[in-house]
């Protein structure tokens, strides 16, 4: 399964910024970006986010660059959260205003009761006049209570099912991202070792050529 686009993983403009920053560092923005965005959402404090980021990027960046990059990412993410919360609040206010405006335009026409309906109701009231108010109240209360319990149970079950589905989906997404990130991390580590070995071999060859030149002189 392909990793979700990092632009979608971060709130506001943070996703696009993170993608560009990772690309400038020579890291896969799709894999690292989605994983980093998930970590930032999960951790609760700035220190926890910094610690988590160090664990992700320690194998990819030099020590002198690591702390600066991690702090830069956390600061950008925090700024985007403030902007995102403000925009969300404005959207909620606008939605409430629109709803109130629509309700104000709705006119409810009172139902006209015919003379025949009035007579029928009067007859029914007279027929059941022997039923006490207390019994009516008890029956009505029992019925209302039962209905409320049923409706409440159905809503609660529906709500719990929805929450469980969302949590399971998020857990699966995190696991998939974690697996893909670990694979990419291992690939990057092997590549760095190969590059380091090749660099060392070039140094050795250059050293031998220099020594040969000195002997010839």
Swiss-Prot record:
Domain of life of the organism in this record? Eukaryota
Q: Where is the composition biased (Basic residues)?
A: 205-217
Q: Which UniProt keywords apply?
A: Coiled coil
Query: Secretion signal: which residues?
Result: none
InterPro entries (alphabetical): CCDC43 (IPR037666)
Q: Which residues form a coiled coil?
A: 34-135, 168-212
Biased composition, Basic and acidic residues: where in the chain?
A: 180-204
Task: Please tell me one Gene Ontology term that the record gives under cellular component.
Answer: cytosol
- The segment annotated Disordered runs over 180-217
Q: Could you tell me which PANTHER family the record lists for this protein?
A: COILED-COIL DOMAIN-CONTAINING PROTEIN 43
Family that this chain belongs to: Belongs to the CCDC43 family.
Q: What is this protein called?
A: Coiled-coil domain-containing protein 43
Organism, per UniProt? Gallus gallus (Chicken)
Lineage of the source organism?
Eukaryota, Metazoa, Chordata, Craniata, Vertebrata
């Amino acid at each position: 399964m392909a990793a979700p686009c990092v632009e979608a993983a971060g709130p506001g403009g943070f996703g696009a910024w993170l993608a560009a920053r990772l690309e400038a560092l020579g890291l896969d923005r799709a894999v690292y970006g989605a994983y980093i965005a998930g970590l930032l959402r999960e951790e609760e404090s700035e220190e926890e986010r910094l610690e988590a980021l160090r664990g992700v990027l320690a194998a990819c960046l030099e020590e002198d660059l690591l702390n600066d990059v991690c702090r830069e990412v956390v600061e950008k993410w925090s700024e985007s959260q403030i902007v995102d919360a403000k925009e969300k609040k404005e959207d909620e206010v606008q939605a409430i205003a629109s709803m109130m405006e629509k309700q104000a335009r709705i006119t409810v026409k009172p139902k006209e009761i015919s003379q025949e309906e009035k007579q029928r109701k009067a007859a029914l009231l007279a027929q059941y006049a022997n039923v006490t108010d207390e019994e009516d109240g008890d029956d009505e209360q029992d019925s209302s209570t039962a209905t409320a319990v049923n409706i409440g149970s159905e809503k609660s079950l529906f709500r719990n099912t929805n929450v469980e589905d969302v949590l399971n989906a998020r857990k699966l997404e995190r696991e998939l991202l974690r697996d893909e990130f670990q694979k990419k991390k291992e690939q990057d580590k092997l590549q760095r070792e190969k590059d380091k070995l090749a660099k060392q071999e070039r140094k050795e060859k250059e050293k031998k050529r220099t020594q040969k030149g000195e002997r010839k002189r």
